[in-house]
Amino acid sequence: MKQGKKERMKRVKLIVAYDGTNYCGWQIQRNGITIEEVLNKTLTGLLKEPIAVIGASRTDSGVHSEGNVAVFDTENRMPADKICFALNQRLPEDIRVLESREVSPDYHPRKQNCIKTYEYKIVNRKIEVPTMRLYSHFCYYPLDVEKMREGAAYLVGEHDFKSFCSPRGQAEETVRTIYRLDVIKTGDLITLRISGSGFLYNMVRIIAGTLMKVGMGAYPPAHVEEILDARDRRAAGPKAAAKGLTLVSLEYETELEKQIQGENKEWKYTLFQDEIVSRGKARLLIHRCRQEDFERLLIRTVHQAVRNGALRVYVRDEEGDGRIIPGKPYGFYVFQAAAEDEGWYVTEK
């Protein structure tokens, strides 16, 4: 670069695969080496400028990845699609960048709607296979796969997964949507393949530990529904070992869903997003909701619409018992009666 001439800043997206055995997870920390730290140091050396990557999924210590996503900004003139090849020559052999390409400056891997897919592998036989020991959980007790599938079915859909997460210091919304949860048996290998809108801290590992309990006969399959209802970590099974877990992929939505529906025993709602792009407007119909869940549902779904680009969100509670109070703060949002639509309340970003 010529002195005094500033190159154009560009944002580069990476698809990162790694064997997490020797790393203390993704995120930089004091007590050990991490994937993020190695990427930052290697990119800084390659591009001759300070680099700090932003990762989509902050996997835990010992967890593997086939397709985590990261981005960084650089002024270096190296073509974005060539960075992966140069980077892989410098990275340790247990980390590889599968793809690098330029993306728009406002692209953020954590703020885009995406479907995350994980796999949890269980070797179910009397004697452990040495070649699988770093990438699977070993269980010598015979597991009933059909019962595991029955138990897994209760977890599909939108639920409060508070029972299936390890508590952390900060308060966290615990409602998530699981789109699919398959229990696949191939010889002695059982694979749990799970896709969802996002996952709580240790959620997949606790689901794996719970379904193994079901497979052992310690819990009947229907007990999984009782665990969900308890909303208490102590109700669920143990947290399975990190080494069996692999982040498989992150699939980002290219188009905004026109309509989102959520339904379970506790609530049912429809979020209409078809006017967000044209008019900055979304509508939320709450068909039914338990009183104790109402405020959380309201805040969470309105926030989702705002995150997706809505400037105004109109809400109607079809049970109509005065649960939306004009002027009262609901998280970051305050509602007023919508002058143009009787029975609707509106909040603005």
Region annotations inferred by a language model:
Residues 2-268:
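Structured-RNA-binding interfaces characteristic of tRNA pseudouridine synthases
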Residues 295-303:
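A short, charged, amphipathic alpha-helix used as a generic interaction element across diverse proteins
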Residues 269-278:
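Short beta-strand/loop segment at the start of cytosolic alpha/beta domains
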Residues 278-289:
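N-terminal acidic leader/helix
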Residues 334-349:
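C-terminal edge-of-domain segments
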Residues 302-338:
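Acidic, low-complexity, intrinsically disordered interaction modules
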Residues 186-188, 280-282, 342:
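Beta-strand-connecting loop/turn residues
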